[in-house]
Amino acid sequence: PYIYNGEEIGMTNCPVKSIDEVEDIESINMYRERIDKGYSKDELIKAINTKGRDNARRPMQWSNEENAGFTTGKPWLKLNPNYTKINVEKDLEDTNSIFYTYQKLIRLRHENAVVVDGDFELVENTSDNILAFWRKLEDEKWLVVANLSGKKQNLNLDISFKKVLISNYENRDSLKDMALKPYEAFAVKA
């Protein structure tokens, strides 16, 4: 997998309220061109907050110290104000953090050929908000289930499994009559 700067700790885009806060020349040029064509400032700022390249260029949020522990000088871009809550130091203190989840996922990928070389088989008849699929290689079978929504989703799979490999919520005993929590995801070995 590709992991972009800050993604491994859950860094989020830093919202801007005005074009004066933007450094990306492509965003600035697009803004000026579209203002001349009659687009609203609010609409353009919203687009820049979603797609602007400055989001991927923010300083790494190392700690909750001044400038997120990145520098004692002035950073080239303003920091996301959430750096006091989302930073490397804080993530390393929590064994259930995004950082450690990435480590587990990478380890599973490196240690299990079924992830890389296994056949992919979509589980049919699930809600549009649920992604469920099998990875199969020889005698190895893994089931991956993810609720892609911010709402509870129901799913009933009459499948037994040997072991929960990874989960972002508490481990399950059964896959029958599941009420998947918002954004719940897990993988089991069948």
Regions found by a protein language model. Name each.
Residues L137-E138, N168-E170, K189-A190:
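Short, flexible beta-strand-to-coil junctions
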Residues L175-A190:
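C-terminal beta-strand-rich structural cap/linker in extracellular carbohydrate-active enzymes
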Residues P1-W142, L148-Q153:
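Loop/helix patches that line or flank the sugar-binding groove of alpha-linked glycan CAZymes
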Residues K152-E170:
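Beta-strand-rich binding/interaction modules
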Residues E140-K141, N171-L175:
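Short, surface-exposed beta-strand/loop "edge" segments at domain boundaries and coil↔beta transitions
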